[in-house]
């Protein structure tokens, strides 16, 4: 993938959550909410505080979805990232 976010933007790949509950109930894709966390794949030159490979949590309605290499990513403004999961 050749994508470089500009300015204070970050490219994030959503982390998929489990599709089965603890009791074994399978949750269909259309009933699941989109995850609010993901892995940073690329960082713009002015985006500070996150690095490629880190797991981050972001605001619910943040970002713009883009399709690259048959995968869906989010381009987020650095201000929409709420924190880093360590």
Curated annotation (Swiss-Prot):
InterPro entries: Chaperonin_GroES, Chaperonin_GroES_sf, GroES-like_sf. SMART domains: Cpn10. It is found in: Cytoplasm. GO terms for biological process: chaperone cofactor-dependent protein refolding. It holds the Pfam family Cpn10. One of its GO terms (molecular function) is ATP binding. GO terms for cellular component: cytoplasm. Keywords: Chaperone, Cytoplasm. Heptamer of 7 subunits arranged in a ring. Interacts with the chaperonin GroEL. Belongs to the GroES chaperonin family. Together with the chaperonin GroEL, plays an essential role in assisting protein folding. The GroEL-GroES system forms a nano-cage that allows encapsulation of the non-native substrate proteins and provides a physical environment optimized to promote and accelerate protein folding. GroES binds to the apical surface of the GroEL ring, thereby capping the opening of the GroEL channel. This is Co-chaperonin GroES. The lineage of its organism: Bacteria, Pseudomonadati, Campylobacterota, Epsilonproteobacteria, Campylobacterales.
């Amino acid at each position: 993938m050749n994508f470089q976010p500009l300015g204070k933007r970050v490219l994030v790949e959503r982390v998929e959550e489990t599709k089965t509950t603890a009791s074994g109930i399978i949750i269909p894709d259309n009933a699941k909410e989109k995850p609010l966390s993901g892995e940073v794949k690329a960082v713009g030159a002015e985006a500070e505080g996150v690095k490629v490979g880190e797991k981050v949590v972001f605001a619910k309605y943040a970002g713009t979805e883009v399709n690259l290499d048959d995968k869906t990513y989010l381009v987020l403004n650095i201000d929409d990232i709420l924190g880093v999961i360590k």
